[in-house]
Amino acid sequence: MAKSHTLNPEEEFEEESGLRPSLLSEFIGQKEVLNNLTVYVQAAKNRKRALDHVLISGPPGLGKTTLAGIVSNELGTRLTITSAPVITKGADLARLLTSMGENEILFIDEIHTLHKKLEEILYPAMENYMIDLVIGEGVTAQMVQIPLKPFTLVGATTRSGLISEPLKSRFGIQLRLDYYNDEEMKEIVLRSSRILGVKIEDDAALEIGKRSRKTPRIANHLLKRIRDFSEVEGNLSVKKGLCLKAFEKMGIDDLGLDGMDRQILGCMIDRYKGGPVGLKAIAVVVGEEEKTIEDTYESFMVRIGLINRTPAGRVATEKAYRQLKRMQDFSENHGQDPTLF
């Protein structure tokens, strides 16, 4: 009988964390980013000083949080993780900053959502390791400067264009993560399978990688679901044929598109003749938040050429029609002879 891998939420979190690389040498892909970051980290270690503040941008799931953890491990310092949406008051941010030890790292995810008044607290903290606090109210109020220990702020964002220029300019190191290629995705799947104790053939790992939207987080999720199918069938190793059957059952196509992706494209084609159409209209039809569509679904489909963003709105490309096997609709929407396709 195959060994069960049913996990409770805590075990699931631990397993997920165990798949993250912990050192720069273990990180696959993002060569230029890694090469530069290796230099910056080594220089900080040599000087025995805090690393310059780091801004990491890129689509979700590419390794921004993982890189913050790696930097912490490489420098041998404590890492404090938080997210901008949960920092609602100046006192919250001040408490975080004053708790930082020398050369420690504060990681703030979704930093583009930080309120402008909170940004202003960060400016002197990042530049001079000081925060200005107002004590008291009215005529008795007075400004007090509180010194901080040297620390490194690592900010992560999926939307770097929304970060104000004054905040962005205070990050001495700015890194951009890009989508991974198929070979890198395959290596990530093989590494994760070794950690999980899953025997997998190379072509199966490549197939999982190709359908993971060029995103390691998705690859790890899909690997675990493929493991489920493999174990239930009593297989000793994961083969490509099993992957293809499992992906068909899960509704994931050869580009990694799932049901929601197809809903979005179908909405554009059926209701708006392929576009242009606004994001708000799409969100209402498919019943999903605009931000989720933009960050999770649309960015990938734009990248692989299924959607074009135009000043008038989103447009489904010819490739999108082909992927959905709807070239007849393309011909009708664009007034072209279907026999040409």
UniProtKB/Swiss-Prot annotation:
InterPro entries: AAA+_ATPase (IPR003593), AAA_lid_4 (IPR041445), DNA_helicase_Holl-junc_RuvB (IPR004605), P-loop_NTPase (IPR027417), RuvB-like_N (IPR008824), RuvB_C (IPR008823), WH-like_DNA-bd_sf (IPR036388), WH_DNA-bd_sf (IPR036390). Mg(2+) binds at T65. GO terms for biological process: DNA recombination; DNA repair. One of its GO terms (molecular function) is ATP binding. Residues 254-341 are annotated as: Head domain (RuvB-H). It catalyses: ATP + H2O = ADP + phosphate + H(+). Its main location: cytoplasm. Pfam families: AAA_lid_4, RuvB_C, RuvB_N. ATP binds at L19, R20, G61, K64, T65, T66, R170, Y180, R217. GO terms for cellular component: cytoplasm; Holliday junction resolvase complex. It is an enzyme of class 3 (hydrolase). Residues 181-251 are annotated as: Small ATPAse domain (RuvB-S). Its EC number is 3.6.4.-. It is found in: Cytoplasm. Homohexamer. Forms an RuvA(8)-RuvB(12)-Holliday junction (HJ) complex. HJ DNA is sandwiched between 2 RuvA tetramers; dsDNA enters through RuvA and exits via RuvB. An RuvB hexamer assembles on each DNA strand where it exits the tetramer. Each RuvB hexamer is contacted by two RuvA subunits (via domain III) on 2 adjacent RuvB subunits; this complex drives branch migration. In the full resolvosome a probable DNA-RuvA(4)-RuvB(12)-RuvC(2) complex forms which resolves the HJ. The RuvA-RuvB-RuvC complex processes Holliday junction (HJ) DNA during genetic recombination and DNA repair, while the RuvA-RuvB complex plays an important role in the rescue of blocked DNA replication forks via replication fork reversal (RFR). RuvA specifically binds to HJ cruciform DNA, conferring on it an open structure. The RuvB hexamer acts as an ATP-dependent pump, pulling dsDNA into and through the RuvAB complex. RuvB forms 2 homohexamers on either side of HJ DNA bound by 1 or 2 RuvA tetramers; 4 subunits per hexamer contact DNA at a time. HAMAP family: DNA_HJ_migration_RuvB (MF_00016). NCBIfam families: PRK00080.1, ruvB. This is Holliday junction branch migration complex subunit RuvB.
